């Protein structure tokens, strides 16, 4: 999929943009899987304001808000989208006649002489060139489609009363690839429910699920394209009996249809429970609690099968068979879950046109998962794509990897808004990836603004709605490194014979780095906002340095 950069890269590590969906941080894979019909709003944080999102916000933040219920009778909606995808440009490949003509020209340019008997075999003769006028293989057209179909369906309902509001949706996406064998299907389910318990307590329950399946041929797209453009249009694609013609190297169509498959199945289920509480007797003081639990699984299966290319004799019998590849099966399963807890205390006060607000947040994230995989080779037949059907026990392997991650953070923010604007925020984050003595980092940010349009000396400009200058400075932290580098890691190495028995060796993974800690990104931004004629024309200009 496409990658996103906000104001360029600002990290030595490949730290991605941070995605936040309904207040919960998610990875890019979860963001890509969102049904677009469920999205209410998307916004981008690109300056010091991203500091409040902490350790993964060094390259900016994309905020997503999903749709919620509205007062009124149930409103049903159904939408469907059908589309056709086509490449923006096809490579202009030579036909057989052009290829043969240019080939002969190239041989001449290299100093060979078609009239010299010792060089004649390097050239296409007149008979072959005339045959090339009518017989030409279109490798690209035979391997790739000119267009593919994609379709999307979505059904939703929303409604509610003063007490309970709901939004529910069900989506289905089906996308074909640009060559046979590629097929992607995805199902999305969402239910957002809001309940008003009393005048002080509101409860939110969000449930969502996603299941997807991607099937594709064993050959990679880039490799398949390379095989196609390297083929000569003078080479046959098929023999007269329909078998694959042996041109001496890998056959693009056979690679697509008969080299095996790769299948990836994913599912993610998320539950979020939120409480919004107005503190009695203290005007403007609110408490918010948000808890999220995600359960995900990923099952990948790769089955490699051999295919045969043939040369036929004049009588149509097989003169030579060439086999590419051998059978092998690899399966891997990942199961993981993560939990996020966010507790927020906010206070808002307005005094004589001046607004002040404060915020204090405690955030905790924990992720646990494990991967288990196995592979076997030399299957006696390809009709059963299961591990038990593999060949020799000596050519089988298995592996497993645990995964753990955790973060804690304390966030504070104070905001003053009026003619002059000021905001100070900080995060105090801890990451399990670092040594206990290097685990915590402090990341502050400050923003200042001045509404010039509120000043008396600007009142003479009656058509000026707003003129504001602003500046911000913030430090962001990044922990996008491998975990446990502050410990000495060991792995199994080669086996050696001791007392007539093989003994596995243990190999050190390197010198531990106890000094590894947060990578920091400093961001400075200066901007001007202006609008005139009741917002008819608005301008926003920014200069930033990272």
Residue spans for each PLM region:
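Periplasmic N-terminal soluble interaction domains immediately after the signal peptide in Gram-negative
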Residues: 45-48, 53-59, 65-68
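A generic structural signal for short coil/turn motifs at secondary-structure boundaries
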Residues: 28-29, 51-52, 176-180, 431-436, ...
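Short acidic/polar hinge/loop motifs at secondary-structure boundaries
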Residues: 17, 22-49
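Extracellular/periplasmic, surface-exposed regions of secreted and cell-surface proteins
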Residues: 16, 186, 192-201, 205-211, ...
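Flexible glycine-/small-residue-rich
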Residues: 6-10, 21, 46, 66-68, ...
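Short, glycine-/polar-rich solvent-exposed loops and beta-turns at beta-strand/coil boundaries
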Residues: 1, 32-37, 54-58, 182-185, ...
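Residues embedded in well-ordered regular secondary structure
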Residues: 1-2, 11-13, 17, 60, ...
């Amino acid at each position: 999929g496409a990658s996103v950069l906000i104001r360029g890269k600002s990290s030595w590590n490949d730290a991605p943009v941070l995605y936040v969906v309904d207040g919960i941080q998610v990875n890019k894979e979860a963001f890509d899987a969102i049904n677009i019909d469920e999205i209410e709003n998307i916004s981008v944080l690109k300056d010091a304001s991203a500091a409040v999102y902490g350790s993964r916000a060094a390259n900016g933040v994309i905020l997503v808000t999903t749709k919620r219920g509205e007062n009124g009778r149930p409103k049903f909606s159904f939408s469907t989208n059908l589309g056709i995808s086509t490449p923006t440009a096809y490579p202009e490949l030579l036909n057989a006649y052009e290829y043969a003509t240019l080939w002969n020209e190239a041989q001449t340019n290299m100093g060979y002489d078609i009239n010299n008997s010792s060089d004649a075999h390097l050239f296409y003769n007149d008979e072959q060139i005339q045959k090339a006028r009518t017989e030409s293989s279109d490798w690209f057209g035979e391997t790739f489609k000119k267009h593919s179909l994609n379709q999307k369906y979505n059904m939703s309902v929303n409604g509610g009363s003063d007490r309970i509001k709901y939004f529910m949706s069900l989506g289905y996406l089906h996308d074909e690839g640009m060559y046979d064998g590629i097929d992607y299907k995805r199902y999305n389910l969402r239910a957002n429910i809001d309940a008003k318990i009393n005048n002080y307590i509101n409860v939110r329950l969000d449930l969502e699920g996603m299941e997807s399946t991607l099937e594709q041929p064993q050959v990679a797209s880039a490799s398949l394209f390379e095989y196609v453009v390297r083929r000569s249009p003078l080479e046959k694609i098929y023999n007269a009996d329909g078998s694959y013609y042996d041109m001496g190297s890998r056959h693009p169509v056979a690679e697509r249809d008969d080299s095996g498959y790769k299948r990836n199945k994913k599912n993610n289920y998320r539950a979020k429970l939120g409480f919004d509480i107005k503190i009695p007797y203290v005007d403007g003081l609110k408490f918010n609690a948000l808890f999220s639990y995600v359960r995900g699984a990923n099952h990948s299966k790769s089955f490699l099968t051999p295919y045969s290319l043939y040369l036929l004799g004049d009588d149509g019998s097989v003169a030579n068979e060439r086999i590419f590849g051998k059978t092998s099966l690899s399966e891997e399963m990942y199961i993981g879950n993560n939990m996020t807890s966010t507790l927020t205390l906010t206070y808002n006060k307005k005094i004589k046109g001046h607004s002040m607000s404060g915020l204090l947040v405690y955030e905790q994230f924990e992720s646990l998962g494990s991967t288990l995989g196995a592979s076997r080779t030399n299957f006696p037949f390809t009709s059963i794509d299961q591990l038990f059907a593999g060949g020799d026990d000596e050519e089988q392997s298995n592996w497993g990897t645990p995964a753990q991650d955790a973060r804690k953070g304390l966030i504070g923010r104070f905001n003053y808004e009026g003619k002059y604007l000021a905001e100070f925020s900080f995060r105090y984050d801890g990451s399990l990836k670092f040594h206990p003595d290097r685990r915590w980092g402090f990341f502050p940010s400050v923003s200042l603004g001045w509404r010039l349009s509120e000043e008396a000396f600007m009142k003479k400009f009656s058509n000026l709605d707003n003129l504001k200058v602003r500046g911000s400075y913030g430090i962001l932290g990044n922990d996008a490194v491998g975990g446990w580098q502050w410990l000495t890691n060991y792995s199994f190495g080669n086996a050696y014979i001791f007392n007539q028995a093989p003994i596995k060796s243990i190999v050190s993974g390197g010198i531990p780095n106890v000094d590894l800690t947060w990578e920091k990104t400093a961001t400075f931004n200066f901007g001007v906002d202006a609008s005139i004629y009741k917002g008819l024309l608005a301008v926003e200009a920014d200069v930033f340095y990272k």
